[in-house]
Amino acid sequence: MGYNAGSYDVIVIGAGHAGCEAGLAAARMGSKTLMLTINLDMVAFMPCNPSVGGPAKGIVVREIDALGGEMGRNIDKTHIQMRMLNTGKGPAVRALRAQADKFSYQHELKKTIEETPNLTLFQGLVERLIIEDGVCKGVITQAGAEYTAKTVVITTGTFLRGEIIMGDLKYSSGPNNQQPSITLSEHLEELGFDLVRFKTGTPPRVNSNTIDYSKTEIQPGDDKPRAFSFETTKFIMDQIPCWLTYTSTETHRLIDENLHRSAMYSGMIKGTGPRYCPSIEDKVVRFNDKPRHQIFLEPEGRNTQEVYVQGLSTSLPEDVQRAMLRTIPGLENVEMMRTGYAIEYDAIVPTQLWPTLETKKIKNLYTAGQINGTSGYEEAAGQGLMAGINAACRSLGKKEVILGRADAYIGVLIDDLVTKGTNEPYRLLTSRAEYRLLLRHDNADLRLTEVGREIGLIKEDRYERFTNKKLQIEQEKERLESIFIKPRPEVQELIRSIGGSELKDGIRASDLLRRPEVTYEHIHLLVPSEVALSDEITEQVEIQTKYEGYIEKSLQQVERMKKMENKKIPVDIDYDAISSLASEARQKLKDVRPLSMGQASRISGVNPADVSILLIYIEQGKIARVSNQ
């Protein structure tokens, strides 16, 4: 027998990385919000790698922070190591990565949630949604509690019909042996949602006291203080190193001999795994010409001896895992503390979503995170933030927010999901962004702080600091444009010392900075600023000056794309009435229901001829419409 348990503006199902961002965003925007989770002790849990960031993903964390989300602030408070990656490459691919103290990360984020006004956190298992006339009105828990809401966000991660698999052992479970969510998955199928079966995995954890670190290579963090959040002013200087080792020929022999016992190769696993995070079995089979593979030993926290064996994700049986670990240099006498495993779970086909992450079938119902077919904490958090923002906007009667492909990696991620779909766990890569020179780690605040302020997630004091930063950047760029540097002896000496060509005539400071060997520090030595400028400001001045021509080209491409994005397609257009469309294009357009010509052009199976036919049809103005959209 059910009972009325309360009414809310927004209900978030799940409290992983997507759920935490969704709940916090909705509450901070003024929506009365309820977060329901299977286990309160697992809020913001990291079931796989104890890290945040990396290529593309680190930029997402910066974007989350620029919009007013929490992940960046939280990892800045709880990391054990920070490293800037790809420092020898251009600014488009530089990204920050942090090793997390996974237990502190959980504790701090749960504390933030508990202290946030408008936000209630409750332990309960959601089994059904309350649906009336195609509109989501709330949720029903296993205990019979009926919570009503204006909007609902599902962020169930890998819990939907989750199954853990190790060798021939298979049992129903969420990650880390938590209770799975079975009934909700069945309910989503009853509602007509298409679900797919995906798989991911995790490596074993070992006892640090039993590792011989003398046989490994130390991987320290950066000496220079780093942060994900633009608000962070206190930096953790006491860093803990990671360690690098490798598999051996004995490791590979052992895996080859036991492939028939791997759930991946025995046929026990049916779900599709992540292409960019293969198991060790996959690596040995697919890259059998490689004599060894990298293994990173990553501490799971400051107050634990557990070490994450990055690069050894596996579904081999426990006895094989024990033996395999001891074939790796430095791990000859290691004690395994947790086994690695594969986990299969249900995900929704993401082309069933609008770009707001609202489902097309059920109004006021949003989904975010691994349920949408992605992998990774950062991808989940970015989706959770946008779903939470849009659920709150809907509940408050405000216009929803859609980030474009030229606005943010989050925009690329969501557009890829809802436009192209995915047939494997989706991982964000820099190569997926066509405007990656514009979507850099360093300029996330310049791109998105205005958006965060408009929706109410950026406070006035932070916005004031942001506008002051923008002003200082422009003033310094103008100063360098106005100053001429003459070929004085000290100038020529500096240029020679860095391998540059001597000046023949005077040169603008900005033009000298455009030389590849010249940095802002060199310019500062020659013509110092009278105003003390932060590293963030001088970095922007240097990047914007050096890459001005390339940035301008990218902006021109964006303007051309915007013309297509601004050509809107009615949601209820009847594609069957456009007889000239190719049959595959017609079906894909009906499935995705793009909102613009730009989105239509990115659907696989819709070729340029189909786009032209659709554009002409819409411009003629006589648009046939379907009644059920």
From Swiss-Prot:
InterPro entries: FAD/NAD-bd_sf, GIDA_C_N, MnmG, MnmG-rel, MnmG-rel_CS, MnmG_C, MnmG_C_subdom, MnmG_C_subdom_sf. Its cofactor is FAD. FAD binds at G14, A15, G16, H17, A18, G19, V126, S181, Q370. One of its GO terms (cellular component) is cytosol. Transmembrane segments: none annotated. One of its GO terms (molecular function) is flavin adenine dinucleotide binding. It is found in: Cytoplasm. Its main location: cytoplasm. Pfam families: GIDA, GIDA_C_1st, SAM_GIDA_C. NAD(+) binds at residues 273-287. GO terms for biological process: tRNA methylation; tRNA wobble uridine modification. PROSITE patterns: GIDA_1, GIDA_2. Keywords: Cytoplasm, FAD, Flavoprotein, NAD, tRNA processing. Belongs to the MnmG family. HAMAP family: MnmG_GidA. NCBIfam families: mnmG_gidA. Homodimer. Heterotetramer of two MnmE and two MnmG subunits. NAD-binding protein involved in the addition of a carboxymethylaminomethyl (cmnm) group at the wobble position (U34) of certain tRNAs, forming tRNA-cmnm(5)s(2)U34. This is tRNA uridine 5-carboxymethylaminomethyl modification enzyme MnmG. It comes from Bacillus mycoides (strain KBAB4). The lineage of its organism: Bacteria, Bacillati, Bacillota, Bacilli, Bacillales. The gene is mnmG.
